[in-house]
């Protein structure tokens, strides 16, 4: 079974703003993540030791799985949106708690500005190197996502990762991956080949000079693999 698959729901369920679902040791809130009170309610009074967050990238992304809310704003509106979300987030974290923010390079300035404005310390930027690129209209085809890394000041920062961790997360995966348009991508070292049905082979240049990304999800259009987190 895919470790990223969620178990099936036993019955039809409904939710409304303010609802907090208790799923074993987990809590899931139907709420506004820019509202500090709603975020505190989701945490149930607890403070986080570490945070992973995957906000909208403001790239107007859409797929068969649907669209992402708050993903097509002006630069100024998006910056304010991030400031509110990060401010609500830092309010439910312990001093010294680590934070990871997946984001898009095209909005890197806004993500970093909002990160600092909320009070976080930036320590670095990690790179998730995917096993498959995403074909688009960019000159360089995107095969990575950046992840801001830092922590909430106010207490000693603790690190448990040893001294062998690097800023590039390459989680492996098959060298063969289907693309959205029915072709196949073949990765050979740092080379990426696209193979069409007529056996035509084209080499493309990815954005990173790999855990496999989920090929599709009916629940979220840009799902992250569990191993990455």
Show where each model-derived region lies.
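Core catalytic lobe of class I
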Residues: 1-228
